[in-house]
């Protein structure tokens, strides 16, 4: 892809993506064993996170990474846009797509328990291009709720697509 097309695509995406609702949703089933294994693999020893199922454990805060990454790689491929009368994907070259960061907000959220089914939906926030590299960056604003429609977490995930990939 030549520089002019990359620049044209960047301008298009910076105009179209902000505040756009991302189609679809991502679901994650929270299983006791996976929650405990996740906590143990990062060295957590607090019984609140690794105790028996009968003790009523909750997911450790780091467990948010597991559902955030699933949401990222489930939702982004579903983004379809109409550019110059042609339908296109957000990431034209999926191997140039990169998950860059997460910022978690647990304010007014309930803890995750074994058996919960998490549902993530998102919109795009700010979108910009690093001029020198022509790498496109975007904020993906995720809202994650459980099966009871209770807020579990709000996440700002970073999306980057290398030049030629968008």
Regions found by a protein language model. Give the residues of each.
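Hot-dog-fold acyl-thioester-processing enzymes
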Residues: 1-101, 166
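HotDog/MaoC-like acyl-thioester-processing domains
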Residues: 1-16, 101-166
């Amino acid at each position: 892809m030549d520089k002019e097309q990359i620049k044209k695509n960047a301008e298009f995406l910076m105009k179209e993506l902000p505040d756009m609702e991302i189609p679809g949703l991502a679901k994650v089933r929270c299983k006791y064993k996976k929650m405990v294994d996740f906590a143990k693999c990062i060295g957590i020893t607090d019984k609140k996170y690794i105790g028996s199922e009968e003790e009523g454990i909750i997911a450790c805060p780091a467990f948010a990474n597991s559902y955030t990454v699933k949401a990222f790689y489930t939702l982004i491929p579903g983004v379809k846009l109409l550019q110059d009368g042609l339908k296109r994907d957000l990431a034209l070259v999926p191997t140039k797509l990169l998950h860059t960061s997460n910022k978690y907000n647990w304010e007014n959220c309930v803890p995750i328990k074994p058996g919960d089914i998490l549902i993530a939906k998102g919109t795009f926030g700010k979108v910009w291009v690093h001029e020198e590299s022509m790498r496109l960056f975007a904020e993906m604003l995720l809202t994650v709720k459980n099966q009871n429609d209770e807020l579990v977490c709000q996440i700002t995930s970073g999306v980057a697509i290398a030049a030629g990939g968008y």
